[in-house]
Amino acid sequence: MSGFVEKPEPVQVPGLTHLHTGKVRDLYRNEAGDLVMVASDRISAYDWVLPTEIPDKGRVLTRLSLWWFDQLADLVPNHVISTELPPGAPADWAGRTLICKSLRMVEVECVARGYLTGSGLVEYDATRTVCGIGLPEGLVNGSELPGPIFTPATKAAVGDHDENVSYEDIAREVGPETAAELRRTTLDVYRRARDIAHGRGIILADTKFEFGFETAEDGTERLIIADEVLTPDSSRFWPAATWEPGRAQPSYDKQFVRDWLTSPASGWDRASEQPPPALPPEIVAATRAKYIEAYEVLTGTNWA
């Protein structure tokens, strides 16, 4: 089993229609037809959305995405219209809410990898390829790749795994021109972010983006980057000072949560069909601190 341990009820706000409850974000539509995206403090691990929230996590993700959108503005436009709180919205939505353009979304997770780890490592160990891209012998967990690669995946529902697919599969799905634009833009954004992060002592190992098309009045379309960008939820950030290929790398993400859930202390058997337990306060505090540290190191600004 997988999914929500306790699925939250959507907040009812006058003038907003609830569309979707995701792992982290709740999506609404306002009366103007724009999307209202609210980043919650929910956290997921091992395909479960956990019953315990991480305070301020949604605000960290939102503020960090906005910072990255500014760094990327000359490469690709983004979907943000406003950060104003909708009338009648709860006060807790402040700092975690974006009013966004309604786009024709491309149903592809656009993943860029500069280092070998995660599902890419599993595939490489079996085939010496990742998403059909041949890689040299001798790579290990954490190895830097000869150059960044585009490794798309199909988007999965809550509780399911995204599935890695080849570029050729994506080209058949969305058309060769769109596939080429997705690959080019994904790798351009990755390279920009990689270089910015490197200057702050951070390795951007891999990351995933979502894109959609905005239609102009004359019927032409342009590619827009959407959802979140370059956050600890969508990316693997490693401290460069401790990078050592051949082992799992320390990271700025929810590793505290994963480690505790798979430890004897949790009492949870991942192989069972039972949902995971609530997180203890010390794991919540350590995870919150790690998200805030990622924000502060990447942006060079204090969270408070």
Curated annotation (Swiss-Prot):
One of its GO terms (biological process) is 'de novo' IMP biosynthetic process. GO terms for cellular component: cytoplasm. This is Phosphoribosylaminoimidazole-succinocarboxamide synthase. It is an enzyme of class 6 (ligase). Pathway: Purine metabolism; IMP biosynthesis via de novo pathway; 5-amino-1-(5-phospho-D-ribosyl)imidazole-4-carboxamide from 5-amino-1-(5-phospho-D-ribosyl)imidazole-4-carboxylate: step 1/2. Its EC number is 6.3.2.6. CDD domains: SAICAR_synt_Sc. It comes from the Bacteria.
